[in-house]
Amino acid sequence: MTEQIESMELAAVAHIKATKNDTFVHITDMTGSETIAKITGGMRVKAQRDEGSPYAAMLAAQDVATKILGRGVKVLHFKLRGAGGVKPMALGPGAQTAIRTLIRAGLRVGRIEDVTPVARDRVRKRGGHRGRRV
């Protein structure tokens, strides 16, 4: 009888916050206390209007992938976050691109989870008594 012993693979958590204005790719250890790498889309492009684009998210994810592969991380658990609260719950345009880029870099996917904050009671919207005058 042969026993197959799996090698211990280092796992990490990828916290991806994708809004319409920017995409954050933040890699921590499993507890979330130690940051391994943190890069935003705005750090990789020059024009401010391009910070939230899928291209900026791809560049940020490529840089993060090279850093964490150098540290020996093989498995990633994804936690995706949109703006949430009073703002839109939908993820920004860079979320899918960031995930796809990290997978193409050779990292395995553990689990994907949506952690967008949801307001249980509606937070009072801006505008005051007479409403927001546009």
From Swiss-Prot:
GO terms for biological process: translation. It comes from the Eukaryota. Coiled coil: none annotated. Keywords: Cytoplasm, Ribonucleoprotein, Ribosomal protein. The keyword Kinase does not apply. It is found in: Cytoplasm. It holds the Pfam family Ribosomal_S11. InterPro entries: Ribosomal_uS11, Ribosomal_uS11_sf. One of its GO terms (cellular component) is cytoplasm. Its main location: cytoplasm. The keyword Cytoplasm applies. GO terms for molecular function: structural constituent of ribosome. Component of the small ribosomal subunit. PANTHER family: 40S RIBOSOMAL PROTEIN S14/30S RIBOSOMAL PROTEIN S11 (PTHR11759). Belongs to the universal ribosomal protein uS11 family. This is Small ribosomal subunit protein uS11. It comes from Encephalitozoon cuniculi (strain GB-M1).
